[in-house]
């Protein structure tokens, strides 16, 4: 596996790199539901192979090369009833009130159903975005997790003042959150030991705007140091870089640099001889408009990933992008005019 210091990577189990001196190899993985495009999908599979893109056999969305699991098991969660606008607490709502044994039991069921091959050796990505294992990161749209955590402590300790309540809420959500995060990886690796497990989007960086463009905000680095246990139990680190139209190109590449730098930093901190490689999730459209990202911008973004130490990119797409014949035809044109030429250029560089 890559040590992030100007190395060349030879494939182990086809997927993951091991290193010798020289230029680094940059892998490209396909996580787009192009099986929804029956008129184009054979052409896409054939040309992906020609351009060195790693894709599941038969264009399956979950297959032999990569499987993305959305909220597997029974992570504690707070959802909202859309009709009554009332909160629903699933498995306790927050980790300190959750049943870890129940979660692990249902996790095993989900993994057995979604990754049926016990010898699966591809990328296994856990997409977990319900809450964060750091208390202060559960603000804004995630503030229900802070509020419930504080309420639980107030019920347990009515004599506590506000500062004491907050400190105890922080301590407990992070303690039990760590158990859910870590034990999920341990269980997953026991069930599919050859798979390359990791959590989608971590480490968070919160960069791209104002003063912190090409580096994480300072508190994010402190927080990531505190969740080193996640990366020490991961086989791969999967940060995410999605773009919006209001970011200038220099800020787009800065966004990439900051997030890749942080992922590489965490990989280097892992106390193992073989450091986890960094594979960056990227969407080929702007998330605010769903317009295709230009060839110029895509080239700059992919080169920024490679230049800053990423081992590869996972190109992700939504079913919404490909839910009509017109969209499928347009996407094939985009592949021919933009993505495949960019992939060739970045692999050569």
Swiss-Prot record:
Report, as the record phrases it, the tissue specificity of this protein: Expressed in salivary glands.
What is the role of this chain?
Answer: Hydrolyzes high molecular weight hyaluronic acid to produce small oligosaccharides.
Q: According to the record, which residues are glycosylated?
A: 41, 81, 99, 119, 147, 251, 297
Q: What is this protein called?
A: Hyaluronidase Tab y 2.0101
Any GO molecular function: hyalurononglucosaminidase activity
Q: Entry's Pfam families? A: Glyco_hydro_56 (PF01630)
Concerning its family, UniProt says: Belongs to the glycosyl hydrolase 56 family.
**Compartments it resides in:** Secreted
Q: What is its main location?
A: secreted
Which key words are in the record? Allergen, Disulfide bond, Glycoprotein, Glycosidase, Hydrolase, Secreted, Signal
For this record, the Gene Ontology CC terms, alphabetical, are: extracellular region
Q: Which reaction does it catalyse?
A: Random hydrolysis of (1->4)-linkages between N-acetyl-beta-D-glucosamine and D-glucuronate residues in hyaluronate
Which top EC class applies here? hydrolase
E.C. number: 3.2.1.35
InterPro entries xrefs: Aldolase_TIM (IPR013785), Glycoside_hydrolase_SF (IPR017853), Hyaluronidase (IPR018155), Venom_Hyaluronidase (IPR001329)
- Fetch the PANTHER family from UniProt: HYALURONIDASE
Disulfide pairs here are 37-328, 205-216
- The highest taxon in the source lineage is Eukaryota
- Organism classification, top ranks? Eukaryota, Metazoa, Ecdysozoa, Arthropoda, Hexapoda
Q: Does the keyword Repeat apply?
A: no
Active site per database record? 129 (proton donor)
- GO biological process terms, semicolon-separated: carbohydrate metabolic process; defense response; hyaluronan catabolic process
Q: Which N-terminal residues, if any, form the signal peptide?
A: 1-25
């Amino acid at each position: 596996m890559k040590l992030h210091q100007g190395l060349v990577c030879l494939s182990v189990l086809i997927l993951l790199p091991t290193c010798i001196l020289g230029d680094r190899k940059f892998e490209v993985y396909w996580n787009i539901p192009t099986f929804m495009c029956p008129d184009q999908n054979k052409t896409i599979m054939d040309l992906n192979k020609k351009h060195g893109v790693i894709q599941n056999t038969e264009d399956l969305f979950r297959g032999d090369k990569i499987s993305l699991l959305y909220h597997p098991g029974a992570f504690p969660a707070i959802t909202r009833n859309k009709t009554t606008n009332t909160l629903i607490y699933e498995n306790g709502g927050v980790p300190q009130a959750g049943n870890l044994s129940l979660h692990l039991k249902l996790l095993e069921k989900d993994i057995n159903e979604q990754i049926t091959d016990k010898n699966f050796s591809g990328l296994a990505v856990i997409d977990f975005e319900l809450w964060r294992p750091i208390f202060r990161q559960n603000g804004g749209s995630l503030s229900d997790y802070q509020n419930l955590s504080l309420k639980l402590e107030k019920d347990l300790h009515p004599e506590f003042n506000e500062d004491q309540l907050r400190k105890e809420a922080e301590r407990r959500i992070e303690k039990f959150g760590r158990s859910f995060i870590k034990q999920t990886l341990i269980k997953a690796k026991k069930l599919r030991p050859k798979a390359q497990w990791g959590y989608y989007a971590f480490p968070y960086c919160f960069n791209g705007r104002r003063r912190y463009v090409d580096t994480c905000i300072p508190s994010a680095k402190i927080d990531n140091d505190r969740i080193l246990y996640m990366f020490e139990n991961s086989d791969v680190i999967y940060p995410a870089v999605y773009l919006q139209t209001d970011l200038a190109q220099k800020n787009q590449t800065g966004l990439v640099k900051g997030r890749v730098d942080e992922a590489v930093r965490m990989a280097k901190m892992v106390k193992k001889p073989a450091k986890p490689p960094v594979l960056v999730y990227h969407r080929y459209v702007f998330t605010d408009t769903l317009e295709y990202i230009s060839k110029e911008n895509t080239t700059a973004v992919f080169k920024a990933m490679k230049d800053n130490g990423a081992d590869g990119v996972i190109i992700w797409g939504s079913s919404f992008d490909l839910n009509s014949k017109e969209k499928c035809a347009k996407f094939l044109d985009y592949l021919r005019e933009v993505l495949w030429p960019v992939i060739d250029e970045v692999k050569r560089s």
